[in-house]
Regions:
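Amphipathic alpha-helical packing segments from all-alpha helical-bundle domains
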Residues: 101, 108, 118-162, 189-200
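Hydrophobic/aromatic-rich alpha-helical bundle segments in the mid-to-C-terminal region
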Residues: 146-194, 202-213, 231, 235, ...
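Short hydrophobic/aromatic patch on the recognition helix
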Residues: 46-56
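Amphipathic alpha-helical segments that line or abut small-molecule/effector binding pockets
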Residues: 24, 85-111, 188-192, 196
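Intrinsically disordered, low-complexity terminal tails and inter-domain linkers enriched
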Residues: 119-122, 207-252
Length: 253
């Protein structure tokens, strides 16, 4: 006898298929550099506007879901090293290739965040759902955790995580790829050089506590150069980010 499928099961499957169709269409459009409105997404997917809006009531809701779907493995990252410098490199090596693969979605998320910031300044977005994420903070806090276990002041470790947050995410990709024209390999070299300088400078300031940084034995002279360069870069970039982004609440990864 043929198997009878109940109406609720059929409806549930249809909804799942429709949601997946919308997500895949949105991802394809974003990767082509097209940031679609919900109406444009509906047209491209062959569904009604009402259906598309039922799944994604705003561009912010759409982008948030697309980012979650495409970067899911990054959010589950767990370190394997006990060295802060090695942990940070692990995170960069693990996350950035996937971020590059879904760069269109991440750029769209940044665009949404900046648009919402502008609306907030103009007092026009009180009822609009905010696009806010905190994964960057969680992942970088996990990366610098060995410093705290080794006896470094938690406030110092937190400041390092804050500085590293300027090197991890869409903003760094935009600056180094768009302004400097770097390819992915060059981009990764610069990011890892900067992150190592920050880690080593922090450990030098903290007295090289318990070798938590993996590579802190670079020498007082080298650490001093790294410290000065890292401090200047962190201060300058932080100032620019604060002026352009309107706060750390808007995070993509």
């Amino acid at each position: 006898m043929p198997t009878t499928v109940s109406a609720p099961e059929t409806l549930s499957e249809t909804r799942t298929q429709t949601r997946e169709l919308l997500l895949q269409t949105a991802l394809s459009m974003l990767e082509q550099g097209w940031f679609p409105s919900i109406t444009e997404l509906a047209n491209a997917s062959g569904v009604s506007r009402a259906t598309a809006y039922r799944y994604f009531p705003s561009q912010a809701a759409l982008v948030s879901t697309v980012v979650d779907e495409s970067l899911g493995p990054v959010l589950q990252w767990q370190p394997t090293s006990t060295s802060v410098e090695a942990r940070v490199n692990e995170l960069l090596d693990f996350a950035y290739p996937r971020m590059e693969q879904h760069e269109g979605a991440l750029r769209a998320a940044l665009q949404v965040a900046l648009h919402q910031w502008a609306n907030e300044r103009a007092r026009r977005a009180q009822d609009e759902p905010k696009y806010r994420r905190g994964n960057r903070r969680r992942l970088l806090t996990l990366a610098v955790e060995p410093m705290v276990r080794a006896g470094v002041d938690p406030a110092v470790a937190e400041r390092l995580a804050q500085a590293l947050s300027l090197l991890y995410g869409t903003e760094a990709m935009v600056v180094l790829k768009d302004i400097w024209g770097l390819d992915f390999r060059q981009f990764m070299n610069v990011i890892k050089w900067m992150s190592s300088a920050l880690v080593r400078a922090t450990l030098a300031q903290a007295g090289g506590a318990a070798g938590a940084g993996g590579g802190a034995e670079a020498g007082a002279g080298g650490a001093g150069v790294a410290e000065g360069a890292a401090q200047g870069a962190a201060e300058g970039t932080a100032e620019g980010t604060a002026a352009a982004g309107g706060g750390a609440a808007r995070e993509q990864v």
